[in-house]
Amino acid sequence: MVAAAEITQANEVQVKSTGLCTDFGSSGSDPLNWVRAAKAMEGSHFEEVKAMVDSYFGAKEISIEGKSLTISDVAAVARRSQVKVKLDAAAAKSRVEESSNWVLTQMTKGTDTYGVTTGFGATSHRRTNQGAELQKELIRFLNAGVLGKCPENVLSEDTTRAAMLVRTNTLLQGYSGVRWDILETVEKLLNAWLTPKLPLRGTITASGDLVPLSYIAGLLTGRPNSRVRSRDGIEMSGAEALKKVGLEKPFELQPKEGLAIVNGTSVGAALASIVCFDANVLALLSEVISAMFCEVMNGKPEFTDPLTHKLKHHPGQMEAAAIMEYVLDGSSYMKHAAKLHEMNPLQKPKQDRYGLRTSPQWLGPQVEIIRSATHMIEREINSVNDNPVIDVARDKALHGGNFQGTPIGVSMDNLRLSISAIGKLMFAQFSELVNDYYNGGLPSNLSGGPNPSLDYGLKGAEIAMASYTSELLYLANPVTSHVQSAEQHNQDVNSLGLVSARKSAEAIDILKLMLSTYLTALCQAVDLRHLEENMLATVKQIVSQVAKKTLSTGLNGELLPGRFCEKDLLQVVDNEHVFSYIDDPCNASYPLTQKLRNILVEHAFKNAEGEKDPNTSIFNKIPVFEAELKAQLEPQVSLARESYDKGTSPLPDRIQECRSYPLYEFVRNQLGTKLLSGTRTISPGEVIEVVYDAISEDKVIVPLFKCLDGWKGTLAHSEINNLPRSPLYNDCYDLSPRMLLLMLLFSDPEFDWS
């Protein structure tokens, strides 16, 4: 048996270090790539996603040589027409040609090699010396998918482009025995945006994605059933597409070439790459809008305190909390909420509900899983994943199973579970936001109109969110547990990588629907808080004026006992949620009128002697006060509402003083949406659709990162890192935070207990 060191030395010409976990010849200190895999996770998730999107938007040409392709490269080539692909001939051409020539040489020698002189799979006992005909037959029998007339049966264009890129990247490593000219033709097809139609279904991603990849081979060989789409949707035959890139005659596949093209995990890995790109962005978005949820709910930002999360040790949780803490730091909403809680500490529970308070603990593990899946897929798209592997250096073909796409199936199952968990949290927060029992004074359903009896706001959207959540949670079920034995029990275990990636892509799309609905609701809540604040100011002003006019002074300017009522009356206004009465502010059955009257009655009882005199009686003033209040308040409330609708409210919108403002500004100004109201014809779905399209087109990424401008990727309070530690610290993971903190304090002899 050849020693590992000899293998490394023999292959060092073919493999170079890339910084990813893709080296064949790892250093002696890291022979199994565990250290390299761990180092790839260094730094924050935020920094990783930022680098990813910077690369995605900044890419103009993607140069590939087999070992340094990234998730963002795949997404950019798949989605952005201005991005071109270039094969790195200097790095890869010689090794590609060497492996191709090796196959032909061995064929001439009569060497028995799987897929070159043998049958396939369970029928590999058959033999032939007609190598070219064997490859032709391979492509013919693998063209077993169904395209049909229904577009739903065809793999999406961006996934197919990604698959062409990933497959080419794999073949560039020179272990597959395929000609350089074939890879160059795929490059030209990509750059001309000529995309073959591949069947959506029919692969188990072991032995690779045989069926869909055979349709790429069908294009290259000009099979009569090959169909190709141009960028503008024109359909043509494979032969016509090849002529458009300068190939007058389709390829006649040489021995091994057909097998090299089809026997790999590239379709599943390609779609998984796109899924990972989206999942990372959406995870970050969910963290920021969870902070925005805290703002509009007048929440308590204490849940982001760094010590709480440092004591839990999980990096994903710590980062999620740190991001939320940064967004909330200095927020005008949080300053206002602190005053509200101080003024009336019993108005809401001591602690916020789990959907907000434990959002870092909930989102953190999802971020860790998504990061892990992303790195696993990035290793896969830089792997050699066909069979046999041509080892030119040792003059042999290695028969193995790198076509098994288990990394794709497993990582996509895990990622999809995390996507569903994020969606579940978004639904929990949304449900709290639209429920007037929990949302801190916002109207039921976030109704934006003046008449709640004719405005049901986001009631339909909440029903839709329940539907999305149910479907998303259904999709959370694993795909890989449903493996069926295939191909005469030769492929008795298989990864279902592409199937799992497809289900994950569905989950991503549903999460986009949920986030667009939720972001619409958050912007609605921001507008309602602005309206609430201006309405409250109007009501307080009128109540104060009416109290002074009717209760404070007599006809001759003398001071009356009722002058002491004003402060308590204004306290009632402060404590009463504006939207509980503002549609009819003087309605006798509404809480504001009742509580104002109660204040006057209480003062009347205290004014015992004064009640005997009609001029100083507070009881006698109640009808006068209420009549004057009705006369002034109703028209002033209407004027305040009119002023708000025109955008001329006197009080500024607090959101402008918040780090979450870029998202709000994006939805309202850049996308041109407005407050939803029953008085307007536009429906919630029309606004949500605009936001959904913007998220799907990656337009939300720029404002998302603006929310985090200046964040250094660390916890806010550096002193947390310098807490005194007990020698028992490392054994205290199971203790409560309070007990652990006490132990830390006792361990410091210089701690000042005064």
Curated annotation (Swiss-Prot):
<dbReference type="GO" id="GO:0006559">
    <property type="term" value="P:L-phenylalanine catabolic process"/>
</dbReference>
<dbReference type="InterPro" id="IPR001106">
    <property type="entry name" value="Aromatic_Lyase"/>
</dbReference>
<keyword id="KW-0456">Lyase</keyword>
<keyword id="KW-0963">Cytoplasm</keyword>
<keyword id="KW-0587">Phenylpropanoid metabolism</keyword>
<protein>
    <recommendedName>
        <fullName>Phenylalanine ammonia-lyase</fullName>
        <ecNumber>4.3.1.24</ecNumber>
    </recommendedName>
</protein>
<feature type="binding site">
    <location>
        <position position="387"/>
    </location>
    <ligand>
        <name>(E)-cinnamate</name>
    </ligand>
</feature>
<feature type="binding site">
    <location>
        <position position="490"/>
    </location>
    <ligand>
        <name>(E)-cinnamate</name>
    </ligand>
</feature>
<feature type="binding site">
    <location>
        <position position="487"/>
    </location>
    <ligand>
        <name>(E)-cinnamate</name>
    </ligand>
</feature>
<feature type="binding site">
    <location>
        <position position="357"/>
    </location>
    <ligand>
        <name>(E)-cinnamate</name>
    </ligand>
</feature>
<dbReference type="GO" id="GO:0009800">
    <property type="term" value="P:cinnamic acid biosynthetic process"/>
</dbReference>
<keyword id="KW-0585">Phenylalanine catabolism</keyword>
<dbReference type="GO" id="GO:0045548">
    <property type="term" value="F:phenylalanine ammonia-lyase activity"/>
</dbReference>
<feature type="modified residue" description="2,3-didehydroalanine (Ser)">
    <location>
        <position position="207"/>
    </location>
</feature>
<comment type="subunit">
    <text>Homotetramer.</text>
</comment>
<dbReference type="Pfam" id="PF00221">
    <property type="entry name" value="Lyase_aromatic"/>
</dbReference>
<feature type="binding site">
    <location>
        <position position="459"/>
    </location>
    <ligand>
        <name>(E)-cinnamate</name>
    </ligand>
</feature>
<dbReference type="GO" id="GO:0005737">
    <property type="term" value="C:cytoplasm"/>
</dbReference>
<comment type="pathway">
    <text>Phenylpropanoid metabolism; trans-cinnamate biosynthesis; trans-cinnamate from L-phenylalanine: step 1/1.</text>
</comment>
<feature type="cross-link" description="5-imidazolinone (Ala-Gly)">
    <location>
        <begin position="206"/>
        <end position="208"/>
    </location>
</feature>
<dbReference type="InterPro" id="IPR008948">
    <property type="entry name" value="L-Aspartase-like"/>
</dbReference>
<feature type="active site" description="Proton donor/acceptor">
    <location>
        <position position="114"/>
    </location>
</feature>
<comment type="similarity">
    <text>Belongs to the PAL/histidase family.</text>
</comment>
<comment type="function">
    <text>This is a key enzyme of plant metabolism catalyzing the first reaction in the biosynthesis from L-phenylalanine of a wide variety of natural products based on the phenylpropane skeleton.</text>
</comment>
<dbReference type="InterPro" id="IPR022313">
    <property type="entry name" value="Phe/His_NH3-lyase_AS"/>
</dbReference>
<feature type="binding site">
    <location>
        <position position="263"/>
    </location>
    <ligand>
        <name>(E)-cinnamate</name>
    </ligand>
</feature>
<dbReference type="InterPro" id="IPR023144">
    <property type="entry name" value="Phe_NH3-lyase_shielding_dom_sf"/>
</dbReference>
<dbReference type="InterPro" id="IPR005922">
    <property type="entry name" value="Phe_NH3-lyase"/>
</dbReference>
<dbReference type="InterPro" id="IPR024083">
    <property type="entry name" value="Fumarase/histidase_N"/>
</dbReference>
<feature type="binding site">
    <location>
        <position position="351"/>
    </location>
    <ligand>
        <name>(E)-cinnamate</name>
    </ligand>
</feature>
